């Protein structure tokens, strides 16, 4: 089965971008509550 390279990259970005965004929000809120 041949995988479309552009679709593969798009799917990775579609998963990575929200994950990184949530991680940044999570870290910022943790730092605010700690200090």
From Swiss-Prot:
The signal peptide here is: none
Q: Does the keyword Membrane apply?
A: yes
> NCBIfam families from the entry?
PS_II_psbM
Q: Which organism encodes this protein?
A: Microcystis aeruginosa (strain NIES-843 / IAM M-2473)
Q: Where in the cell is it found?
A: Cellular thylakoid membrane
Q: Per the UniProt record, which residue ranges are transmembrane?
A: 7-27
Q: Reply yes or no: does the keyword Thylakoid apply.
A: yes
SUPFAM superfamilies linked: Photosystem II reaction center protein M, PsbM
Please give the positions of the paired cysteines in each disulfide bond: none
Quote the protein name from its UniProt record.
Answer: Photosystem II reaction center protein M
- What's its membrane topology? Single-pass membrane protein
Listed A to Z, the keywords are: Membrane, Photosynthesis, Photosystem II, Reaction center, Thylakoid, Transmembrane, Transmembrane helix
Q: Would you say which domain of life the source belongs to?
A: Bacteria
The record's family statement is: Belongs to the PsbM family.
Assembly and oligomerization: PSII is composed of 1 copy each of membrane proteins PsbA, PsbB, PsbC, PsbD, PsbE, PsbF, PsbH, PsbI, PsbJ, PsbK, PsbL, PsbM, PsbT, PsbX, PsbY, PsbZ, Psb30/Ycf12, peripheral proteins PsbO, CyanoQ (PsbQ), PsbU, PsbV and a large number of cofactors. It forms dimeric complexes.
* Any one GO BP annotation for this protein: photosynthesis, light reaction
Q: What does this protein do?
A: One of the components of the core complex of photosystem II (PSII). PSII is a light-driven water:plastoquinone oxidoreductase that uses light energy to abstract electrons from H(2)O, generating O(2) and a proton gradient subsequently used for ATP formation. It consists of a core antenna complex that captures photons, and an electron transfer chain that converts photonic excitation into a charge separation. This subunit is found at the monomer-monomer interface.
The gene designation is psbM
The cross-references to Pfam families, in alphabetical order and at most eight, read:
PsbM
Gene Ontology cellular component list: photosystem II; plasma membrane-derived thylakoid membrane
